[in-house]
Amino acid sequence: MKKVLALVVAAAMGLSSAAFAAETATTPAPTATTTKAAPAKTTHHKKQHKAAPAQKAQAAKKHHKNAKAEQKAPEQKAQAAKKHAKKHSHQQPAKPAAQPAA
């Protein structure tokens, strides 16, 4: 297949190229001298298996509790008390009534 393609390309370029293409297509690659060395001894390495983690419920895997959640929850307040901060009252505290001497 390569020779046919090379000849078609060579015909398009000219006959001088055809001889060059035929030579390059048919020349085999030079063979290297074969000296076989003894194969290296293969060592098999054992894999270390990790210990299996304790099984957990599916919900426990997904939801992690934070340390903040374990602290004591603040005292609950009414919704209005959360929104409206109390302001200082300008009234003076009432003085206790003088008790008559008995």
From Swiss-Prot:
Propeptide position ranges: 22-58
This protein's GO CC annotations: periplasmic space
Compositionally biased region (Basic residues): 80-90
Chain intervals with Low complexity compositional bias: 22-41, 91-102
Signal sequence annotation: 1-21
Main location: periplasm
Coiled-coil regions listed: none
Protein name from the UniProt record: Acid shock protein
A Pfam family that the UniProt record links to this protein: Asr
Record carries keyword Signal: yes
